[in-house]
Amino acid sequence: MAQIRQEALKKQKSETQKSTEGFVDIGNLAQWTCSSEKSGFPIRLVRDDNIDTYWQSDGSQPHTIHIKFVKRVSIKYVSMYLQYTLDESYTPSTLRISAGTGFQDLEIVTTVQVEEPTGWVHVPVGDFGRNGLLDVHLIQIKILANHQSGKDSHVRLIKIYAPEIEQPAIAVDEIPYTSLQFISRNQLR
Amino acid sequence: MLELKTNVIQDPELKDSLDLQENDRVEIIGDAVHYIVNDHLNRVFNYTVDQQKIHAALITTFASGKKAIVVILDDIGYVYYVGDNNNDSYIINVPFSTESAWSSPSGLYLQRHRSSDENLNTDLPHIFCLNDPLDELTLIKFDGKKILSLFDSIVYVVGEIVVTHNKKEKKLSFWRSRFIDPESDQSIKSSRNRRRESSFSREKNPDLTRSDSIHYTANTRLSEKFEEQGLAYSTIFSHIESFPITGSTSFDSILGNGVLVITTLVKELEKGYMMLFRLVRDRSPYFLDSLQLHAINLSAIKSKHLQKIVVLSSKGKVSLESPMSPSLPIEGTFRSFRVHGATLYLEDTDGVQRYISLDNRASNSLVKWCLSVIRYVLPLREYEIFYTGHLYALFAFKLSHDEAFISSILACFTFFSRDKVHVEPIEDCNEAYSLSSKFHFKKEILIASQLSSHLDYSTFKNYLMPLAITLHFISEELRLDSVVKPRKDQLVALLLQITTWLKWPRYCEYYNFDIAETFLSIPLSIQVDVEEPVGPTSILQWIIECLRSQSTVPFYGLESYGLPHSCSTMFPQTLSLMQLLDCLLNPNMTLQNLVEEMVRLGISRKRCERYPFGILCIIFTVLEIAAEEYSPNWESEELRLVNRLDVDSFLHPKTPKWVFNKQDQEVKEIKALTSTVTDSTLVDTQSFHPYKVVTDMIFREDRRLAEVNKLLNYSSQITIMTEHFDVDLSSVPMQQKVAQCICVRTLSVPIGAGMLTYGSKNPLPTEKVTPRLFNFTLHLHPGTLIIQPNKEFVTQELTEWPEFNVGVALGLSISKFSKEINTSWIMFNRPETLTAYHAGFLFGLGLNGHLKALATWHSFIYLTSKHDTTSIGLLLGLASSYLGSMDAKVTKLLSVHISALLPVGSNELNISPLTQTAGILGIGLLFHDSCHRRMSEVTMEEILASNESELKNEGYKLAAGFSLGLINLGRGSNLPGMSDLKLVSRLQVGISSQATFQSLEAGSPGAIMALTMIYMKTNDLEVAKKIDIPKSRYLLDFYRPDLILLRVAGKNLIMWDEVKADYEWVKYQIPDIMLSQFDLQEKKVLSSDDLLLYNVLAGICFSLGLRFAGTGNPKAKEILINFLDSFIRLCHLPAKTHDERVTAVTVIRCTQIVALSSSCVMAGYCDLDVLRRLRVLHGRMEPVNYGAQMATHMALGILSLGGGRYSLSRSNLAIAALLISFYPQFPRTTQDNRAHLQAARNLWALAVEERCIIPRNQDTKQPCIVPLNVVQKSGAVQKLEAPILLPPYDSISSVSTLGDKYWNLKIDLDNNSDYRELLRESQTLTLMPYDRTSSKEEPLNLFPKLKDTSSPLWNLVKTSRLFQSSNSPLNVASLQESNNKTSLGVKLLLSMDFDNLTRDRLLSLQILLQFFESCWTGVLLNKFHSRQYLFLSRDLVEDLSLRVWEYVYSHNHNEESV
């Protein structure tokens, strides 16, 4: 049984990686909060890389998830793992993704309709930004509706993908050091 | 025999009101004691409760010099002090039954009641003294052989003399009492101590006390008994005289000439006795004489002039007796009499009530004055004779006061005439006519001769000269008052008569000049030879002499005639004039000193006008000069004297400001009046308020204020021009969209409107103020389409906060200085159910400090109703009313609304987060600038609390940050007792880039604000660096862009002095990495890459705006407008993509900040450049949200703060308040309070400073326009036109008014520190209208002008006789037209009265001309510097001198020809 699950997981991973090649999940840079959560199904479960666990809301719609980054980031995808077969009426159907620098200037990026999703839903938010990337400090995922007019929602995994940048030799001007001592040692001689 | 006649009392009701008994007295009436002062019941002491009989009540003076009423009951006594500032009362214990009580010079004597069966041999003392209510009773010692026996009882006390009567020996004894202080008198004390000792060891030295030379009454054993009880001696009685008299009653006394006369009556014998004692200072009085009279009643009558004894003889004759002066019999026979004050009431044998008043209650002040002077000059005995004559003339001959006085004077002279006065009766008509027009003293002389035949004036021989001289000086004094000329003439006539009799030729000649033609002298030869004294002294002549010699020549006053020097005080006018002249001619005294001297002498402006013209002109010239060079130290009196009421009302403001406003209210425009009948929706209710007069005057050149009014109007229908819209407005959804946009815009207006109407109302106690309601009606211009937003759109939630703001605006419109705001007024305005309007109204009142008047229990009623907005409004309102007071009551109220301040483990508060946010902000206001440790700690913990919840959101933490900042506002590192809190380092964690990791970011704005406010203006570089933004892009990415703005602004507020209004400084503030993108003009698209730059720029602008708030600094304005233009341009860039949209939000926010900043700089100035740009911002509809519109309207409001009457202060509190209310995170929707509590946007009211200078006309009290010269401390000179906003008070060096219409007023703020406060408080310059041109060019004579007019009315007036005299009504009327009344009046009188120049008038003119002549040289030249023509023009003076010369010449010529 465990083996099957392992395999399924592997399959899943490969599936994920296929569409996200060249991108890296930067969700760990963010602070995750949600509008409500059922006890035993906290929001951190969307970050545990386990498709069997999930976050469940506990309140009235719309449910929101806030992903707050510590710094400005450029992102390409917001990906969610939804499983209609298991969650049925708990599966979100209408999602609105907003982004901005803070709560004060959240602007709608896109609204997504999903039909009985099984597996990853990749929302290419980068397409709405500049040069295919969206610069954000804060992402808000708002679940406006569920399938079959369900009340609470299940979200199993969420990943935020940013382009994987080959860190070149660190440009001098990018180094935050300002003191003479540090600058003098920031390159290998 | 002459007898005094009495008047019949017609109306018995009135008889008590005829004369007042002037000293106070007490009367026992039943159970009460009445204290009567000046015949009016003053106090009533009631003793019904004590249920004891009142034995005695008296007024006395205790040893301490305090007057008191003493009331003695059975065993208790009450003492009430009746002094001016001492109203204590005491209860004394009376250990015996009191027979009688008498006031003594130092307290009172109490006489014990002796029962008939008392053992006569015990010989206990029965008379005690009480010297102080707190002392015990004391005994009496006797000096000499004679002592009081038990049968002696006090029957009368007067001064030192005590009269006792011995029933057994039928003897009347007189004693002198002396008070000795038992404390100070060593011999007594020691003897007392010895007595104490001796009580234990009596056997050892029983004779010790006997060795004392003083005898005392009781036998040793008994007296010791008293002494053991602690009784001491305090008074010594020494025997004077004893008479064997029995049954004597009704004692009374009069005192005169050092002789005390005590009278007593023995009813059975129908005899009265007078005992005369000579009083000698510090020695025992000695007995002079005793007289016996037949009398059935006796009483003393004391008037100011005479002290007499009224004697009623058995025959019914009443006479006034005194041992020294002649007796005055009264006509008629009488049954009884009584004395009340100086009035004698009589009942004659027919039962008719009559009275006679001895006191000369003359209506005639001249007679009164003359009498008092004569009283001073004559010895008492002579004066009594003189006054007796006066009384005879009054009452026996029924003369008037004047005639009586003249007769009594003449009588002194006629006495020395041998021949009978022969006055022939008036025979023919001609003579009668000629007599009636002339002065003559026929009647008076006739009576005088009768008087002199009755009274013995023989001692007057030596006093004739002083009497005449005294009258002469009185007449001289009268010459100094032009009003009393008829009285003076009468007196001069009397003098002429006297001097003719005395054969004093020089005096006769002198008086002849005055009245020769109108006086008929009656010849009489006087047998006594009185040598003529030195020539008649003329005060006017003396003034001329002084002016000529420019020094005070000696004046032959009364003292030079052998009269006492102190006599001169009897002539106040002469004395003060001499002092003034001395002042004028003293080279060391300035003209200002002269004015001070005048005030000291009590000479008012009115009094000056009564001086003879010459003196008047000199004094007015001085006053005129002093008016221009007033001394800054002068009090009101001096300033009033020189007629500088403007300076006076500035330096000594008396009327509160709101009094002025009432007057303004009366001025209503026609528009306002008609508004009541026309449709109310069409009337702009905002456009008229009490200050409209002033604000209209400030912006009199254009209609900018009307425009602002229109923009900030939320209560009337809005018309929009459809052609300005690209979209098609014909479809209903589109219309609805527009309507909703406009609706949101309207909702954002109230805060701004509140700024415009700030402090414009002074409601009456009965006036209900009602909020103006929103009107969302929209009129599409071409056409008549009127649309409303959907009912579903306008929900209660949508309008709740805007309504709150409307309420605040209404509350703030009530002036800070309103006096009528109290609990009942607030309750009167309270609606049935609590609304957001009322909540805001409470907050608004609180901001202006009016909630201090709210009773505590009313606040509980408000709070227990749990109406959210009401709680917020009330808590914030109370906190701001009690700003910085740490009031315990309000602290409690706030604490129960903040969970953080409740003890750990207490129940969850069921209070909304917003109320808690308001509560924690309220704590900051309440503890403002207190450095309260506990509150600082709590607020800091709240900022840094990491668990973000619904309650502790960003807004709550920000409020906590503000609170922390307010508590320690501007203290910097100087925080007493808080070093262990590590405020800086802990707050720094909250704002570091790591904050997000620790979930602290929500607290970052609060932490930044707290640090900024604590270190505000400290120029602390260390802390500024900590707040400042990092310089590298990598690190910058870690910060939320909007926090960058706060950090930049915060850093600059700390480095307050570094902030400069120039581009160099601005550029220096921008981090190097952004410099390349610095130019906003080049931005073609909105990009989120520029977010940081925009925020940095807005931050710089925000700090500039606050740094130069209210200064109107032109450079700062230029920079800010430059940025504002750039940002407005950026706002118009398309925002389609997400990135652009996100950037657009920031751009709009930054635009608002820059707009607000530029308004801040120009606060109250209503600057047109800023106004134009704000109008553009107001006109936007999409995609602007509620917050942005709110900011625009706040900017508009600040720009026109209070209609241009207010500006912003730059105190720490003001900057903090501005920081809070302009906090650059505006709500996105009307319900949004997430980042910042909307209610706190109204705190700007704490930063308002009233700085508009309003000149007012002194006469009309109406504001007026006057050019001003304002010198700043930097030396810059500004020319302004008041009313206008002044620069900040601290930067002004002096303010002076210019222009010709008003007296120039210069206020030097640098030299007088008080002036700055005065100006800050009043902001009013009261100006005196002054017509500089009139005094110089006005024609010499009004006649030619009037004669030219040809109206028939004028002709009539011209021919009438009235017009010919100088005081004609016409002249008075024409005078009043002129501003400079006195000057013109004097000129007219001077020029018109040449036809009948009297000598005095001529002298007066000579004084004037001499003055002008003297002004060319000497002391007067130095003082006047040819300014002597200020009051009278040079032409006039020259013309006058010519006329005088002509007159004198012709006069002399006539005389020669005659």
Curated annotation (Swiss-Prot), chain A:
Residues 2-187 form the DOC domain. InterPro entries: APC10/Doc1, APC_su10/DOC_dom, Galactose-bd-like_sf. GO terms for biological process: anaphase-promoting complex-dependent catabolic process; cell division; protein K11-linked ubiquitination. GO terms for cellular component: anaphase-promoting complex; cytosol; nucleus. Keywords: Cell cycle, Cell division, Mitosis, Ubl conjugation pathway. Signal peptide: none annotated. Gene3D superfamilies: Galactose-binding domain-like. The keyword Phosphoprotein does not apply. Belongs to the APC10 family. The APC/C is composed of at least 13 subunits: apc1, apc2, nuc2, apc4, apc5, cut9, apc8, apc10, apc11, hcn1, apc13, apc14 and apc15. Interacts with nuc2. Component of the anaphase-promoting complex/cyclosome (APC/C), a cell cycle-regulated E3 ubiquitin-protein ligase complex that controls progression through mitosis and the G1 phase of the cell cycle. The APC/C is thought to confer substrate specificity and, in the presence of ubiquitin-conjugating E2 enzymes, it catalyzes the formation of protein-ubiquitin conjugates that are subsequently degraded by the 26S proteasome. Acts as a positive regulator of the anaphase promoting complex (APC)-cyclosome. Involved in G1 cell cycle arrest in response to nitrogen starvation. This is Anaphase-promoting complex subunit 10. The gene is apc10.
Swiss-Prot record, chain B:
PC repeats lie at residues 873-895, 959-982, 1006-1024, 1099-1124. The lineage of its organism: Eukaryota, Fungi, Dikarya, Ascomycota, Taphrinomycotina. Pfam families: APC1_3rd (PF21282). The APC/C is composed of at least 13 subunits: apc1, apc2, nuc2, apc4, apc5, cut9, apc8, apc10, apc11, hcn1, apc13, apc14 and apc15. GO terms for molecular function: molecular adaptor activity; proteasome binding. It comes from the Eukaryota. One of its GO terms (cellular component) is pericentric heterochromatin. This is Anaphase-promoting complex subunit 1. Residues 196-210 have a biased composition (Basic and acidic residues). Belongs to the APC1 family.
